[in-house]
């Protein structure tokens, strides 16, 4: 009996040890997941307690490996936008990859925020002034904490933002791989009309009138007056379109950034963008970027009503006097932007 009793006692001790080990492991697992779900809180420079991304999760982790097991509708939407760009690049490889290798000069539109590991490709006439303001605040390059305190002209001073072309090749490759890259796009012809209205119908834009207006009038207007040739301040939209579709124009020099195509400014067939925001959902998409960057607790995208904004109805009116032939040629110039960013052919177009 004694050997049997000793054996039972020994087995009981083993069972208790195994149970204690399992319980301890279970408690450790609970603590681990609690720490994952409740990252350390730090105080941001604006005096508000928010979750600080540094030392925890990067924007790329937040985007592609969210803590929530189920993807949000927003994440699914942006995945669809990424897929649209990829599919368009693949289907139009000959057209979209005319250049196989990018040079540092091709990266001058990509603004870098080191602190939050963000890269933003700015596209003129797609809320780029406000996004440059935000990038100035995020990167700490300036004296401002409120984006709307930054004068518009100061947001466009190149020294106030660091762009990707300022880095060495290894540094460029590292940031393209590790940082969250995003851009904002707009219906191509609405953006084009917005650029025309801003640069050619406003009297204060004398530099554009001199640089481009005089050239457009000289090339496209018969019997132009000497005053028009000298000032270049009364360019008609029809003349602007004729200038854009003229093969000589792009052979002479690249388009100005305000009417250059997005795929030529940001190179989405060479650079994988993690987020494609749209002007039509500007506030929602912008605040999603800020949330992924871990700053939505104290920074929001600036919103204000702009009565001079170019609308779809306005764009329709501008295209009424453009011939079907010129509309077709202009669509070919911006075709990749329409396809990549899933904009349908406008109803007002009369394509040949």
UniProtKB/Swiss-Prot annotation:
GO biological process: apoptotic process; carbohydrate biosynthetic process; cartilage development; chondrocyte development; developmental growth; embryonic digit morphogenesis; embryonic limb morphogenesis; embryonic skeletal system morphogenesis
Cellular compartment(s): Golgi apparatus membrane
Residues in the Lumenal compartment per record: 38-352
Enzyme Commission identifier(s): 2.8.2.5
Catalytic activity: chondroitin beta-D-glucuronate + n 3'-phosphoadenylyl sulfate = chondroitin 4'-sulfate + n adenosine 3',5'-bisphosphate + n H(+)
Coarse class of the protein's main subcellular location: Golgi
CC annotations in GO: Golgi membrane
Cytoplasmic side: 1-16
A GO term, aspect molecular function: chondroitin 4-sulfotransferase activity
Residues modified by glycosylation: 205, 223, 321, 342
Topology term for the membrane: Single-pass type II membrane protein
Reported function: Catalyzes the transfer of sulfate to position 4 of the N-acetylgalactosamine (GalNAc) residue of chondroitin. Chondroitin sulfate constitutes the predominant proteoglycan present in cartilage and is distributed on the surfaces of many cells and extracellular matrices. Can also sulfate Gal residues in desulfated dermatan sulfate. Preferentially sulfates in GlcA->GalNAc unit than in IdoA->GalNAc unit. Does not form 4, 6-di-O-sulfated GalNAc when chondroitin sulfate C is used as an acceptor.
Protein name: Carbohydrate sulfotransferase 11
Source organism per UniProt: Rattus norvegicus (Rat)
Higher taxonomy: Eukaryota, Metazoa, Chordata, Craniata, Vertebrata
């Amino acid at each position: 009996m004694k050997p049997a009793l000793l054996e039972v006692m020994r087995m009981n001790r083993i069972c208790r040890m195994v149970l204690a080990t399992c319980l301890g492991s279970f408690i450790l697992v609970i603590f681990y997941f609690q720490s994952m779900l409740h990252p350390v809180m730090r105080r941001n420079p604006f005096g508000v307690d928010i979750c600080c991304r540094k030392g925890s999760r990067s924007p790329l982790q937040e985007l592609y490996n969210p803590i929530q097991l189920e993807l949000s509708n927003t994440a699914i939407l942006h995945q669809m936008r990424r897929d649209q760009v990829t599919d368009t690049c693949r289907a139009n490889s000959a057209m979209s990859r005319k250049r196989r290798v990018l040079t540092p000069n091709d990266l001058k539109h990509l603004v870098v925020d080191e602190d939050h590991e963000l890269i933003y490709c700015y596209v003129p006439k797609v809320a780029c002034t406000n996004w440059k303001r935000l990038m100035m605040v995020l990167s700490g390059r300036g004296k401002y904490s409120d984006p709307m305190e930054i004068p518009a002209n100061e947001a466009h001073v190149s020294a106030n933002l660091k762009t990707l072309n300022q880095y060495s090749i290894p540094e460029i490759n590292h940031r393209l791989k590790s940082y969250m890259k995003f851009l904002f796009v707009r219906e191509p012809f609405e953006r084009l009309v917005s650029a025309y209205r801003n640069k050619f119908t406003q009297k204060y834009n004398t530099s554009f009138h001199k640089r481009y207006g005089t050239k457009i009038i000289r090339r496209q207007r018969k019997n132009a007056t000497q005053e028009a040739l000298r000032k270049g301040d009364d360019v008609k939209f029809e003349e602007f379109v004729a200038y854009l579709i003229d093969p000589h124009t792009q052979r002479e020099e690249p388009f100005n950034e305000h009417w250059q195509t997005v795929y030529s400014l940001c190179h989405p067939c060479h650079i994988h963008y993690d987020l494609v925001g749209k002007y039509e959902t500007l506030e929602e998409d912008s605040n999603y970027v800020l949330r992924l960057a871990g700053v939505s607790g104290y920074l929001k995208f600036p919103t204000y009503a702009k009565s001079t904004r170019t609308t779809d109805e306005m764009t329709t009116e501008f295209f009424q006097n453009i011939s079907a032939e010129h509309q077709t040629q202009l669509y070919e110039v911006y075709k990749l932007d329409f396809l990549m960013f899933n904009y349908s052919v406008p109803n007002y177009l009369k394509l040949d």
